[in-house]
């Protein structure tokens, strides 16, 4: 008798090719439900609908399809237990040798803006997890596949082992099944419990050489089953990504995501921008960002919000860089970049979408916060000095504010012509960061903009900025001594804008 495969998937990637190989190369019979059965039928493949096999129609609008003894008996039967085989025979149940199942897209559903509770609940799979757990439990006697990435390996197993997957493969596949259901249930529990329960689940995507330092083991995990963010990026060339590369790439992505309307470039070192700029073309933006701090740019991470063209690629090859990320890279640019084969060049079409929540571990637990995704809204800004901003000054203030948001606190950023001139990051006092940023800017500080991620507890930052030639300041406000800083700004002829929003970054 031909072997029996049950196929019931939401993600139909690779489904038809797998099913065709099962039928034509290994003589499997196929049973399937709902949309999967229709897809197989449309492809011209012989398939029996689950409802026809069980003799029970799908009911409750499709909520009950595979929850039937003829399905679960065929999955859970032990082929080496006589009483199990007798039960199968008495109930006219065929043993199922392969279960291919993946689950309703619950996580992608709840990630959609405005999704309702009812919409989320409808995407809670019942039959899928039941089949997945049952077949994973009985791995000694059948194979379960829950990821299209497993299909080719499974077919190779059949070809190499006379049509039967090895026990080692079946056990590995079963583990993947249990991990899949555990992650799925955790996502549901986290969603329904709100802040009462938070579960972080991931599948190891890649073992990394080490973490921040060589003595720290590290690995890269993917959340969910669908590649998104960095797991969806395409690496065009270069060495394997390191832990520090990935951390810096994410910092670069967050900055570049602030700018969509104008070509933008940023260069990151240790998660802080050493140069960020806007320009009419992407090559000009990169040149401006590089020249903002050419010394620090050496060995940096570059992010661009426009595709890499030949001119930009030529500029990128003039110095040592760890990584370059952009939405795309044309063929001529790839050819030029290939001359620097160690540089990791990645493309990611969507650089704007990041995690909605951030997690940080502490002793005995972890902290969860919403990502700092609030968009800058100049209509809510308050001009608190006598001097009012010109349209160009307002645009420069906005640029400086967006960059400052992504600099480690205490953060001070000096900019001009939509280019960073100086970045003071991570100092224990604000005046210290101010002095660093102004020292980097040098004479270029005259007429420039200064942004601060936090309020000024004293007027010393204003006076130090004015002495260096700064013409305008943007900061959150909120200090008990705000009026001291405003008074100093008016005395010294500076423009000051309060945003009402703080952007601490630790």
From Swiss-Prot:
Keyword Secreted assigned: no
Documented EC number(s): 2.1.2.3, 3.5.4.10
Protein name, per record: Bifunctional purine biosynthesis protein PurH
Pfam families: AICARFT_IMPCHas, MGS
GO biological processes: 'de novo' IMP biosynthetic process
Pathway: Purine metabolism; IMP biosynthesis via de novo pathway; 5-formamido-1-(5-phospho-D-ribosyl)imidazole-4-carboxamide from 5-amino-1-(5-phospho-D-ribosyl)imidazole-4-carboxamide (10-formyl THF route): step 1/1; Purine metabolism; IMP biosynthesis via de novo pathway; IMP from 5-formamido-1-(5-phospho-D-ribosyl)imidazole-4-carboxamide: step 1/1
Domain MGS-like: from-to ranges: 1-146
Family: Belongs to the PurH family.
PANTHER family: BIFUNCTIONAL PURINE BIOSYNTHESIS PROTEIN ATIC, BIFUNCTIONAL PURINE BIOSYNTHESIS PROTEIN PURH
Cited InterPro entries: AICAR_Tfase_dup_dom_sf, Cytidine_deaminase-like, MGS-like_dom, MGS-like_dom_sf, PurH-like
Taxonomic lineage: Bacteria, Bacillati, Cyanobacteriota, Cyanophyceae, Nostocales
Keywords: Hydrolase, Multifunctional enzyme, Purine biosynthesis, Transferase
HAMAP family: PurH
Domain of life the protein comes from: Bacteria
Domains as described in the record: The IMP cyclohydrolase activity resides in the N-terminal region.
GO molecular-function terms, A-Z: IMP cyclohydrolase activity; phosphoribosylaminoimidazolecarboxamide formyltransferase activity
Single GO cellular component term: cytosol
Species in which this protein is naturally found: Nostoc sp. (strain PCC 7120 / SAG 25.82 / UTEX 2576)
Catalytically driven reaction(s): (6R)-10-formyltetrahydrofolate + 5-amino-1-(5-phospho-beta-D-ribosyl)imidazole-4-carboxamide = 5-formamido-1-(5-phospho-D-ribosyl)imidazole-4-carboxamide + (6S)-5,6,7,8-tetrahydrofolate; IMP + H2O = 5-formamido-1-(5-phospho-D-ribosyl)imidazole-4-carboxamide
Record keyword Transferase present: yes
């Amino acid at each position: 008798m031909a072997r029996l495969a049950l196929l019931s998937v939401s993600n139909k990637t690779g489904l038809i090719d797998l099913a065709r190989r099962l039928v034509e190369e290994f003589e499997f019979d196929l049973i399937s439900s709902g949309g999967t059965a229709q897809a197989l039928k449309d492809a011209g493949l012989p398939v029996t609908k689950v409802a026809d096999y069980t003799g029970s129609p799908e009911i409750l609008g499709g909520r009950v399809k595979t929850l039937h003894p003829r399905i679960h008996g065929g999955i859970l039967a032990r082929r080496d237990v006589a009483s199990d085989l007798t039960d199968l025979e008495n109930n006219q149940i065929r043993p199922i040798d392969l279960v291919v199942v993946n689950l309703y897209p619950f996580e992608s559903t709840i990630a959609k803006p405005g999704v309702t509770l009812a919409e989320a609940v409808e995407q809670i799979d019942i039959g899928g997890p039941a089949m997945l757990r049952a077949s994973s439990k009985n791995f000694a006697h059948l194979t379960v596949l829950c990821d299209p990435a497993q299909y080719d390996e499974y077919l190779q197993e059949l070809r190499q082992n006379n049509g039967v997957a090895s026990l080692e493969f079946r056990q590995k596949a079963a583990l993947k099944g249990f991990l899949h259901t555990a992650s799925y249930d955790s996502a549901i529990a986290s969603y329904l419990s709100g802040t009462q329960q938070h579960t972080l689940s991931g599948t190891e995507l890649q073992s990394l050489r080490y973490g921040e330092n060589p003595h720290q083991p590290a690995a890269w995990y993917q959340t969910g089953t669908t590649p998104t963010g960095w797991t969806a990026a395409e690496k065009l060339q270069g060495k394997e990504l390191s832990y520090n590369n990935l951390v810096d790439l994410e910092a670069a992505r967050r900055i570049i995501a602030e700018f969509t309307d104008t070509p933008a470039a940023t260069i990151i070192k240790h998660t802080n921008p050493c140069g960020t700029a806007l320009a009419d073309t992407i090559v000009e933006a990169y040149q401006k960002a590089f020249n903002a701090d050419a010394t620090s740019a050496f060995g940096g991470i570059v992010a661009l919000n426009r595709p890499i063209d030949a001119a930009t690629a030529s500029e990128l090859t003039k110095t040592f860089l760890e990584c370059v990320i952009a939405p795309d890279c044309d063929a001529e640019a790839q050819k030029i970049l290939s001359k620097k084969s160690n540089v990791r060049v990645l493309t990611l079409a969507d650089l704007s979408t990041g995690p909605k929540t951030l997690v940080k571990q502490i002793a005995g637990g972890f902290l969860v916060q919403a990502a700092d995704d609030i968009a800058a809204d100049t209509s809510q800004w308050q001009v608190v000095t006598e001097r009012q901003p010109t349209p160009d000054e307002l645009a420069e203030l906005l640029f400086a504010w967006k960059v400052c948001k992504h600099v480690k606190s205490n953060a001070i950023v000096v900019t001009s012509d939509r280019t960073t001139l100086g970045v003071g990051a991570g100092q224990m006092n604000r005046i210290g960061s101010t002095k660093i940023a102004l020292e980097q800017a040098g004479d270029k500080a005259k007429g420039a903009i200064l942004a601060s991620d936090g309020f000024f507890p004293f007027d010393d930052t204003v006076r130090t900025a004015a002495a260096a030639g700064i013409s305008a300041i943007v900061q959150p406000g909120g200090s008990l001594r705000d009026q001291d800083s405003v008074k100093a700004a008016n005395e010294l002829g500076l423009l000051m804008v309060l945003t009402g929003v703080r952007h601490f970054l630790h």
